[in-house]
Amino acid sequence: MIRTMMNAKIHRARVTESNLNYVGSITIDSDILEAVDILPNEKVAIVNNNNGARFETYVIAGERGSGKICLNGAASRLVEVGDVVIIMTYAQLNEEEIKNHAPKVAVMNEDNVIIEMIHEKENTIVL
């Protein structure tokens, strides 16, 4: 059986920009992407903690060290600058792969700096 499992999460990032007139996507600081192993053009699910919106888009790599989290195109209608968001990717894994799967979670501060990296095999952490 194949199951869809959370693979990476950027937890409590703050939206730094919103650009309605761009063709789409979310731009994320490349340092953050590398920390959680999210690739450019990878599909992401986004949850807005401020208004409850949930949506999907794809990733564009942003300038390193910028802390940039910019929603582009139609997705920009679902956020305001300063909103707290959770950005996730998922992987489809078989039962054997699941046994060794450890999602990467980057916990962010209010300046979009990683303050903690979590590599857990079991979902035992409450944030």
Swiss-Prot record:
<keyword id="KW-0670">Pyruvate</keyword>
<feature type="modified residue" description="Pyruvic acid (Ser)">
    <location>
        <position position="25"/>
    </location>
</feature>
<feature type="active site" description="Proton donor">
    <location>
        <position position="58"/>
    </location>
</feature>
<keyword id="KW-0704">Schiff base</keyword>
<keyword id="KW-0963">Cytoplasm</keyword>
<keyword id="KW-0566">Pantothenate biosynthesis</keyword>
<dbReference type="GO" id="GO:0005829">
    <property type="term" value="C:cytosol"/>
</dbReference>
<feature type="active site" description="Schiff-base intermediate with substrate; via pyruvic acid">
    <location>
        <position position="25"/>
    </location>
</feature>
<feature type="binding site">
    <location>
        <begin position="73"/>
        <end position="75"/>
    </location>
    <ligand>
        <name>substrate</name>
    </ligand>
</feature>
<comment type="function">
    <text>Catalyzes the pyruvoyl-dependent decarboxylation of aspartate to produce beta-alanine.</text>
</comment>
<keyword id="KW-0068">Autocatalytic cleavage</keyword>
<protein>
    <recommendedName>
        <fullName>Aspartate 1-decarboxylase</fullName>
        <ecNumber>4.1.1.11</ecNumber>
    </recommendedName>
</protein>
<dbReference type="GO" id="GO:0015940">
    <property type="term" value="P:pantothenate biosynthetic process"/>
</dbReference>
<comment type="pathway">
    <text>Cofactor biosynthesis; (R)-pantothenate biosynthesis; beta-alanine from L-aspartate: step 1/1.</text>
</comment>
<keyword id="KW-0865">Zymogen</keyword>
<dbReference type="InterPro" id="IPR003190">
    <property type="entry name" value="Asp_decarbox"/>
</dbReference>
<keyword id="KW-0456">Lyase</keyword>
<comment type="similarity">
    <text>Belongs to the PanD family.</text>
</comment>
<dbReference type="Pfam" id="PF02261">
    <property type="entry name" value="Asp_decarbox"/>
</dbReference>
<dbReference type="GO" id="GO:0006523">
    <property type="term" value="P:alanine biosynthetic process"/>
</dbReference>
<dbReference type="GO" id="GO:0004068">
    <property type="term" value="F:aspartate 1-decarboxylase activity"/>
</dbReference>
<dbReference type="InterPro" id="IPR009010">
    <property type="entry name" value="Asp_de-COase-like_dom_sf"/>
</dbReference>
<feature type="binding site">
    <location>
        <position position="57"/>
    </location>
    <ligand>
        <name>substrate</name>
    </ligand>
</feature>
<keyword id="KW-0210">Decarboxylase</keyword>
<comment type="subunit">
    <text>Heterooctamer of four alpha and four beta subunits.</text>
</comment>
